């Protein structure tokens, strides 16, 4: 089983993972390759959708599409790849995107490393949960200028976007970001058949 998580404003970071667990086990290497591919493909699909909708109808239309279609893309992607997908962020918009304890620790670490200018483009480790081994992979997502219209300082968000946010996400926590902040992460959890 794979859990993939995406956040809006996707950015493919190419920095090598200096703090990632390194291994030569072929099973782990295959899982890591899969996780990277999943992250890139899923992130690229959602990013393309958002940019296309921004060009067609502006940020309000992109937000409407994102709130409805991005989750569908994720579910469809899961069905095709055989994985379970969701989004996580410390400051989430959709309550479905609350991180699990592992993801929360890593997102907090990403925030700290980002402030220290030491954030890598990915993180992975093998963990044991309920007696099973998993590869946990996370790719931080950094706020880009295009993200600010929906995720930036609340007072600068356009009125039509604010209205949609209030209607669809009354408990929205995903505002007041600045360009360069960690918005969330794409996270992939892959079951490993043998114990590590």
Residue ranges and their predicted role:
Residues 2-13:
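Bacterial N-terminal signal peptides
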Residues 19-144, 156-196:
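Extracytoplasmic c-type cytochrome modules immediately beyond a signal peptide or single-pass transmembrane anchor
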């Amino acid at each position: 089983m794979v859990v993939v998580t995406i956040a809006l404003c996707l950015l493919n970071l190419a920095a090598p993972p200096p703090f990632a667990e390194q291994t030569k086990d072929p099973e782990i290497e295959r899982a890591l390759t899969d996780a990277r591919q999943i992250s890139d493909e899923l992130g690229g699909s959602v990013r393309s959708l958002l940019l296309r909708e921004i060009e067609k109808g502006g940020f309000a239309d992109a937000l409407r599409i994102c709130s409805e279609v991005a989750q569908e893309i994720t579910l469809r992607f899961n069905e095709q790849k055989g994985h379970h997908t969701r989004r996580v962020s410390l400051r989430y918009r959709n309550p479905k995107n609350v991180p699990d304890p592992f993801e929360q620790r890593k997102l907090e670490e990403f925030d700290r490393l980002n402030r220290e200018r030491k954030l890598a483009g990915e993180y992975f480790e093998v963990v044991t949960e309920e007696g099973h081994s998993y590869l946990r992979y996370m790719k931080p997502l950094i706020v880009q200028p295009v993200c600010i219209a929906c995720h930036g300082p609340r007072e600068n968000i356009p009125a039509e976007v604010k209205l949609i946010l209030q209607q669809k996400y009354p408990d929205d926590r995903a505002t007041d970001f600045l360009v360069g902040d960690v918005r969330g992460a794409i996270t992939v959890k892959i079951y490993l058949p043998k114990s590590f």
